[in-house]
């Protein structure tokens, strides 16, 4: 292993990994007295193993908070969705896995397709600064985005304000669908959230190592094995190779 790579990715001799605890698909065990477990932490463990260093988790409640700490020497790598706004401060690999994002609509809704949601007068509840919120912010032309801080809060807002649609990741919307009798998850997806590994800017050797790592773990079946290990088959899918 090149000393330059270790210097760029683990300058303190330990790999500090920013983990987004709000993504229940990627962090499936968030017990307070143990390290987080799931596909995302296991990917980080493998990065640290290949670097030959220890690992330290830096836990965040939202991905937006991770992005806020970019460039502040708070973490070395970050496992979050790759979005253009975040790429202004973070260099990303290609995605190692993907999650479908779509809408939940209430009982009796006239909205039957994703395309119908983006029209004047439609109000969409969304978790603020999530990867799919960033996508919607760039792409929604006519509907109004109503933001809440966190996944559960966005559902509560959707219900309390009687909004027209709730944006979210399909597996989480399936849970909300069970809570709201008569609600419907619209078919298809408006985007697929790309889960990637990021590092700080100007770490060319370190980034190249991470890029190669992600591609190798996709093609070798390592990512697929993690998805099966953590019981999220059908919720997460291995991203296509670069």
Indicate where each model-derived feature is located.
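Ligand-binding clefts/hinges and TM-proximal coupling segments of bilobed small-molecule sensing domains
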Residues: 1-7, 131-148, 185-186, 215-242
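Extracytoplasmic small-molecule ligand-binding "clamshell" domains
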Residues: 1-81, 86-88, 147, 220, ...
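Hydrophobic residues within well-ordered alpha-helices
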Residues: 47, 69-71, 117, 157-159, ...
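A ligand-binding cleft/hinge motif common to bilobed small-molecule-binding domains
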Residues: 64, 81-89, 159-191
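Flexible hinge/capping segments at coil-to-helix
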Residues: 96, 105-123
């Amino acid at each position: 292993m090149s000393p330059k790579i270790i210097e760029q990715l683990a300058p303190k001799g330990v790999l500090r990994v920013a983990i987004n605890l709000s993504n229940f698909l990627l962090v499936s065990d968030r017990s307070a007295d143990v390290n987080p477990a799931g596909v995302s932490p296991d990917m980080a463990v493998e990065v640290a193993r290949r670097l030959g260093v220890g690992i330290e988790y830096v836990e965040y409640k939202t991905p937006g908070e991770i992005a806020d700490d970019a460039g502040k020497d708070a973490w070395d790598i970050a496992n979050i969705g790759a979005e253009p706004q975040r790429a202004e401060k973070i260099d990303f690999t290609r995605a190692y896995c993907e999650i479908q994002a779509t809408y939940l609509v209430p009982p009796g809704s006239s909205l039957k397709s994703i395309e119908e949601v983006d029209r004047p007068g439609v109000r969409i509840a969304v978790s603020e600064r999530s990867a799919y919120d960033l996508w919607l912010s760039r792409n929604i032309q006519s509907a109004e985005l109503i933001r809440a801080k966190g996944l559960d809060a966005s559902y509560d807002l959707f219900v309390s304000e009687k909004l027209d649609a709730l944006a979210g990741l399909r597996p989480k919307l399936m849970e909300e669908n069970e809570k709201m009798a008569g609600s419907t998850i619209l078919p298809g997806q408006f985007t697929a959230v790309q889960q990637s590994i990021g590092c700080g800017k100007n770490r060319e050797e370190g980034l190249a190592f991470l890029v190669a790592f992600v591609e190798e773990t996709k093609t070798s079946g390592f990512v697929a094995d993690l998805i099966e290990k953590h019981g999220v088959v059908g919720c997460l899918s291995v991203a296509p190779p670069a």
